[in-house]
């Protein structure tokens, strides 16, 4: 990753190099993202497509000052949608349909949901309908002061399954997922907020009815106000 001068277009600094970074065994990267303070970089490797927009990947965190690379998580399982907190001190990410927070100052990992299960419960990641129709994959958001994390929970337990054959090996295999056809049941959605300091979760009152959508959930500039678009 090379820093360029905007006016001259000349390279002025190498910010990250797989050949010189400490603890780095990578040969190439897929993508990267700076934290808001530009002290750390999220490094993405081995991106694997899932649906139209979504993908799984392996994340690393690069400390620019220390020239040091380390995995985002030491625990098994592919990671999705990692996002720095506004203060740059934490990273929220999804794994196995659950949400986690990595506290970078202490190098600790906190699991904030535990009910995630494939083809049943999804926390913070769009189900197939939301990704396809609204074009979004990440459904969790940090509050501006980095003290709260809001997310959408998708309960797709009552959705009928659909299967198709995948021909990527000598013997094809069937892929089965929840696919609501027109007129059929969609996911039951709810919005939740996790308090980082108190380690408590609250469900937001979003009105009545189950046949609804929450295409956008976003914090306002007020740390106590969460904007929810309901359809």
Across the structure, where does each feature detected by a protein language model lie?
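Beta-propeller folds
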Residues: 1-231
